[in-house]
């Protein structure tokens, strides 16, 4: 008539022990020269591989261009309905842009800041980045200086821009 707890303990104790054990998966196999995964809530680095390796940012450069455009609008120095003059340098037929992503803008044809913003973000238009860079800073070179100042203020100490679009340049690098 005695009831033994032994069978229940044999089943229950391992289950409780497993429930309290955090299962941490091994890092995924990623075919990349560099990566970094950070927990959004805690800021803890979950997995990394060569996080300080400088690589060409390519079209990720356009994120900084679009960010500066948005900042200029937020500060009231630029309006989305402003008309931009497209230079021959920003023209889609510029040989620098051959074979690259374009918005297909032309000199002498009116284009608004909003259209250029869409051309940068949606079409990844290299011509659109130069047009907005020239409109904001007077020249692409002056805009690149602005990009590098923003990068420094953001703590992107190993990022250096050489153009507004991300086409290859040996010194156009980021981590």
Summary of predicted features, one role per range:
Residues 19-175:
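Active-site-adjacent loops and short helices of periplasmic peptidoglycan-processing enzymes
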């Amino acid at each position: 008539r005695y009831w033994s707890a032994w069978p229940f303990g044999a089943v229950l104790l391992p289950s409780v022990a497993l429930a309290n054990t955090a299962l941490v998966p091994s890092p995924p196999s990623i075919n990349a020269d560099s990566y970094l995964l950070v927990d959004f809530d805690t800021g803890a680095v979950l997995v990394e591989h060569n996080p300080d390796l400088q690589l060409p940012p390519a079209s990720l450069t356009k994120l900084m261009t679009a960010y500066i455009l948005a900042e200029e609008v937020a500060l009231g120095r630029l309006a989305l309905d402003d008309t931009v003059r497209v230079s021959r340098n920003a023209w889609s037929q510029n040989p620098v842009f051959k074979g690259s992503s374009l918005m297909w803008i032309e000199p002498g044809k009116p284009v608004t800041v909003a259209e250029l913003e869409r051309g940068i973000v949606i079409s990844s238009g290299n011509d659109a980045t130069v047009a907005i860079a020239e409109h904001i800073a007077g020249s692409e070179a002056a805009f690149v200086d602005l990009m590098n100042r923003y990068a420094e203020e953001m703590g992107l100490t190993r990022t250096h821009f050489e153009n507004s679009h991300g086409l290859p340049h040996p010194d156009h690098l980021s981590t």
